[in-house]
Amino acid sequence: MGCDIHGYVEIVKYPRSSPDWWTSVIEIDSLVGRNYGMFGLLFNQRNNDNYKPTQEYPQGLPKYKFPEESTTFKESERWGEDAHSHSWISYKDLKENTDWNQEVTSNYICFYEPQNDGTLLYRGGFMMSSELTDEEHHRIRCGEEITKVIKFGEGEKEYVYKLGTSKVKDSISSDWQTLFDMMESLAKHVGEDNVRLVVWFDN
């Protein structure tokens, strides 16, 4: 079953003399899509890439001084029990405490087609495959590289299976980059501590 993200970008309401008065300015549902790389990196949800997350555990919703006036709070309540892992992160934390240069061995098994020049051509990746036995899955997850011939109708192909490598920079899709750019613009206007991303997930 897939997992999706919902939530809002919030800023401290003008005039910013009261740090407790936040207002919702961007509904992220309309902007970003499902991206397990970003879910895992920021909030440790569906972290199949094995990134070191900015937040290891959900923080819950922020404490709203006036929850009845908060679009974010009311929308999260509307989701009820279908929502889980509520959390939030300030733009400052996003910028300073996220390791954007990570390159790690992921939990994804990748398969490659050997080429005549000795290189491997990437063909795809998965968590589980009917083409591999349970024992082979286990061996690969323990770091072993397996070469196997797979039959396709009357033909066959040789593939190499091994754990893949994940790079944070490769996981940032254009929609998520747009979100980060918008948060950066807001932070320049109202301050890095006065911009935050509030989210929850559903399966």
Regions found by a protein language model. Give the residues of each.
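Acidic (Asp/Glu-rich) sequence patches and key acidic residues
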Residues: 1-192, 202-203
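Conserved GNAT acetyl-CoA-binding A-motif
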Residues: 194-198
